[in-house]
Regions:
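Extended, charged alpha-helical coiled-coil/arm scaffolds that mediate oligomerization and mechanical coupling
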Residues: 130-203, 207
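Glycine- and acidic
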Residues: 62, 187-192, 267-271
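Walker A/P-loop
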Residues: 278-279
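Basic/polar, acidic-poor N-terminal "presequence/leader" segments
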Residues: 1-17, 192, 199, 203-206, ...
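Conserved NTPase motor "head" modules and their coupling/switch loops across ABC/AAA+ ATPases, GTPases
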Residues: 200-275
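Charged/polar positions within long, soluble alpha-helices
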Residues: 55, 59, 81-88, 109-119, ...
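Short coil/turn segments at secondary-structure boundaries
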Residues: 67-71, 185, 220-221
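Conserved amphipathic alpha-helical "coupling/scaffold" segments
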Residues: 1-146
Length: 281
């Protein structure tokens, strides 16, 4: 079952998701499409990663690097269509080549920040420096793309001739356009072998965005990292309904946290009408 199938359950999950401060729309879409983990190992692994982010976020000394990371994550865009074109050996247009270059440069920048925060071991980001080299032959490190003169001496010469012409020269233009098309085809073929790495990098950056947002939400709501019990007893201490708690606080009222423990047998919750039984459930 995917998360998007559960968000309408009346347990405050949608409220928490709506208040999750992610920096990319792609990250939120990926979260909603996430398959809910069912095995203990996957759940513990997710919490282990989140705990590392939490420990980094709560340290004031890391704030400058975290601000830089958040700023970079705002530039994360989904380019799955372009990646699929690479997988299918299509020739990319200039916009798609720009998207690939932008993602590769963004991945490298974020990888450097993750190293400084000592989080690089938590989430693997593929090395895309070769992709940048292919799309940045002059080493300018600028997140723009066009068919650079460096790709072809002949193209450079044709462009030079067109610049000095007073009138539009259709023959020169067509010849230059033909060379540009050949270069696009060559670049697309070179980049096609990096399609899987680009896809993995895109997902890794979104995963970083999500864990960063979850870490801040953990601090904001004073949440805990649960232990998974293996003795058949489920126990919660200080449990609260986030949406109800938030609504009460806006009226200067307090939510009374609930402690509850139950076994793998039928459990009956009793209490007065309007006493909070449904909220607990």
């Amino acid at each position: 079952m995917r998360l998007k199938q559960l968000i309408e359950q009346p347990c405050g999950l949608k409220f928490m998701l709506d208040n999750l401060d992610v920096h990319s729309g792609y990250s939120r879409r990926m979260l909603l499409d996430t398959e809910m983990p069912k095995d203990i190992l996957s759940i513990e692994n997710n919490y282990e990663i989140l705990k590392e982010f939490y420990d980094v976020v709560k340290e004031q000394k890391n704030q400058s690097q975290i601000n830089s990371l958040q700023f970079k994550l705002c530039n994360l865009k989904e380019i799955q269509g372009t990646i699929n074109h690479l997988k299918n050996k299509y020739v990319l247009d200039d916009i798609e080549l720009f998207e690939v270059k932008h993602l590769a440069m963004l991945s490298i920048d974020i990888q450097q920040i993750m190293n400084k925060l000592q989080l690089n071991d938590m989430i693997f980001i593929p090395n895309l420096e070769e992709v940048v080299s292919i799309l940045d032959p002059d080493g300018m490190k600028i997140a723009t793309f066009y068919i650079y003169d460096s790709y072809s001496g002949k193209l450079s010469e044709l462009r030079r001739k067109m610049k000095v012409k007073e009138d539009f020269d259709e023959a020169l233009f067509n010849e230059a356009s033909g060379i540009e098309d050949e270069i696009r085809a060559k670049l697309s073929m070179q980049l096609s072998k990096y399609a899987d790495e680009l896809e993995a990098a895109q997902k890794s950056l979104a995963f970083i965005d999500l864990n960063l947002a979850k870490a801040y939400q953990t601090i904001k709501y004073n949440l805990c990292f649960p232990n998974i019990a293996d003795d058949g007893v489920t126990e919660y201490e200080g449990m609260f309904h986030p949406e109800v708690k938030d609504a009460l606080e806006q009226k200067d009222r307090a939510f009374q946290p609930v402690d509850i423990a139950f076994w793998n047998k039928p459990t009956l919750i009793t209490g007065a009408n309007m006493g909070g039984k449904t909220v607990v459930l």
